């Protein structure tokens, strides 16, 4: 029987001039193959006023997680009035604990173009935990992460 395991969605930062520290990483369950788990969890992006952000509408929802074969798809719902997301580049940074405690070379940036975005985490099977070059797709872009992939298994 397959062990249940979790994936951690990395910390979220907004980076117009530099990295703005965000809230803690979010742990999400991994569905069985073919299963969809409805999450509907709101994630607030913490901003520093010194960077010119206000505290309004700086959030998005994780709608659901779907698994197909060994791929995980996370559906994100961005508020249409989310000024920070619309104006800025959203930086997803892989932080300590996932990739050997270093985030160097493990970040990707995209500009949100519409309300919905899809995060594809590709091939997250236990057999690939310590392999390199795990791929993550975000909306219209793809970024190859250089491991080791340190998924938390429970």
Regions found by a protein language model. Give the residues of each.
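Alpha-helical, hydrophobic structural elements that either
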Residues: 1-154
């Amino acid at each position: 029987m397959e062990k249940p395991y979790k994936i951690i969605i990395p910390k979220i930062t907004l980076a117009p001039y530099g990295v703005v520290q965000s809230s803690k990483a979010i742990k999400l369950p991994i569905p069985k193959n073919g299963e969809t788990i409805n999450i509907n969890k709101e994630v607030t992006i913490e901003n520093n006023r010194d960077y010119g952000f206000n505290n309004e509408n700086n959030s998005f929802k994780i709608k659901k997680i779907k698994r197909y074969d060994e791929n995980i798809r996370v559906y994100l719902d961005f508020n249409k009035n989310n000024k920070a997301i619309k104006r800025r580049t959203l930086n997803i940074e892989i932080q300590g604990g996932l990739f050997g405690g270093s985030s160097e070379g493990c970040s990707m940036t995209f500009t949100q173009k519409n309300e919905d975005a899809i995060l594809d985490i590709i091939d997250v099977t236990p057999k690939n935990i310590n392999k390199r070059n795990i791929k993550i797709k975000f909306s219209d872009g793809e970024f190859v992460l250089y491991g080791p992939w340190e998924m938390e298994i429970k």
